Swiss-Prot record:
GO biological process terms held by the UniProt record: L-proline biosynthetic process; proline biosynthetic process
Keyword Lipid metabolism assigned: no
Transmembrane residue ranges: none
GO molecular function: ATP binding; glutamate 5-kinase activity; RNA binding
Residues that coordinate or bind ATP: 3, 160-161, 202-208
Residues covered by the PUA domain: 267-348
Organism: Xanthomonas campestris pv. campestris (strain ATCC 33913 / DSM 3586 / NCPPB 528 / LMG 568 / P 25)
Source species taxonomy: Bacteria, Pseudomonadati, Pseudomonadota, Gammaproteobacteria, Lysobacterales
Superkingdom assignment: Bacteria
This protein's pathway: Amino-acid biosynthesis; L-proline biosynthesis; L-glutamate 5-semialdehyde from L-glutamate: step 1/2
Stated name of the protein: Glutamate 5-kinase
Catalytic activity: L-glutamate + ATP = L-glutamyl 5-phosphate + ADP
This protein's encoding gene: proB
Length: 362
């Protein structure tokens, strides 16, 4: 799995440039020649769109303008990658809804698997033309990590515009030293992450470490490297360690539990009491309506939500899971016995608000 950021593809005067993409394509080709399957997650659609329609670019960060720029630039982005390969390049656009909904998640996995079987090169991007929240808050680093787990990748390579992870921000601290390997993403390591390296993209070093943590939970190592360095890219193509290697977690979680833990959540929360919290964390129980204190947001049945304990200390997230009931229904059956669900609602989807098989404790 290779993730390429906007800063490596955007031309100085606008649009896309093959300057660094060529070396990355050669890295991909070397892996393909070695018999490995490769999936690319590539940013750059918005940057490409700015050159096509400067008038839209003048609108700045307005969501509608960025969506229009993404629509204009996505074809250019795919064309950039296709020029480097004889094999067909397949465009795959995903949203958080595709990753949050279990059926769509599995459909995406099946599609990517078939593309790889057919010998195509999937190039994935978020569908920024419709993903309002992703344009404001999202990034392709975390998308790459989730997709890496989706396709059961062996490694995640994140190409950036610096040499990897440093002990401090090298742009402001002359004593910063590069880290060749990171055995564990501790709080100390996360604190080393600075801000975004470029105004072109939306992800900084912090999001790359978050992505590495997500990939690591699935047993996938992450490599952060400087995609602007021809020497580094050539070294990687020859299986030499260049940049920062971030080890995978010692214990790999099951595929479904991984999805429950890392899939995007619907903006909504189920609030529980201390008794329910104990049942979830210590006994591995399902969440029953009697332990529910309320619900926030407007989630639907089947949505992924966070489960919070709210007490005198405050509110904190204890678990995530797929709700069997909508937010409105959860509020109506809160504090009630399971046998009261059908008399109250007029229907029942089962005695659990969240079944233990659809729940992961954080």
């Amino acid at each position: 799995m290779l993730k390429v950021g906007s800063s490596l593809l955007a031309a100085d005067g606008g649009g896309l440039s093959p300057r660094f993409a060529l070396g990355l394509a050669q890295f991909v080709s070397a892996n393909l020649a070695a018999g490995r399957e490769v999936v690319i997650v590539s940013s750059g659609a918005v940057a490409a769109g700015r050159a096509i329609l400067p008038k839209a670019a003048e609108a700045g960060a307005a969501i509608a303008a960025r969506q229009a720029l993404a629509a204009l630039g996505q074809a250019q982005l795919i064309a950039l990658w296709q020029r480097f390969f004889e094999r067909p390049v397949a465009q795959v656009l995903l949203t958080h809804d595709d990753l949050r909904n279990r059926r769509r998640y599995l459909n995406a996995r099946a599609t990517l698997g078939e593309l790889l079987r057919l010998g195509a090169l999937p190039v994935i991007n978020e569908n920024d033309t419709v993903s309002v929240d992703e344009l404001k808050l999202g990034d392709n680093d975390n998308l790459a990590a989730i997709v890496a787990a989706l396709v059961d990748a062996d490694a995640l390579f994140i190409a950036t515009d610096i040499d990897g992870l440093y002990s401090a921000d090298p742009r402001s601290n002359p004593l910063a030293r590069p880290l060749d390997e990171v055995a564990e993403l501790s709080a100390e390591v996360l604190a080393m992450a600075g801000g975004s390296g470029s105004s072109v993209g939306t992800g900084g070093m912090r999001t790359k470490l978050e992505a590495a943590a997500k990939a690591g939970a699935a047993g996938i190592e992450t490599y952060l490297f400087n995609g602007r360095s021809a020497e580094v890219v050539r070294g990687l193509a020859q299986d030499r360690l260049c940049g920062t290697r971030i080890h995978a977690a010692r214990t790999r979680i099951a595929a479904r539990k991984y999805w429950l833990r890392h899939a995007p959540v619907e903006p909504g929360t189920i609030l529980i009491d201390a008794g329910a919290a104990l049942a979830l964390t210590d006994k591995g129980a399902s969440l029953l309506p009697g332990g529910v204190a309320g619900a926030e947001g407007d989630f639907r049945r089947g949505d992924m939500v966070e489960i919070h304990l709210r007490d005198s200390v405050g509110s904190r997230c204890l678990a995530r899971g797929v709700s069997q009931y909508s937010a409105l229904d959860v509020r109506r059956i809160a504090r009630r016995h399971s046998r009261e669900i059908e008399p109250i609602l007029g229907y029942s989807y089962g005695e659990n608000v969240v079944h233990r098989d659809d729940l992961v404790v954080l």
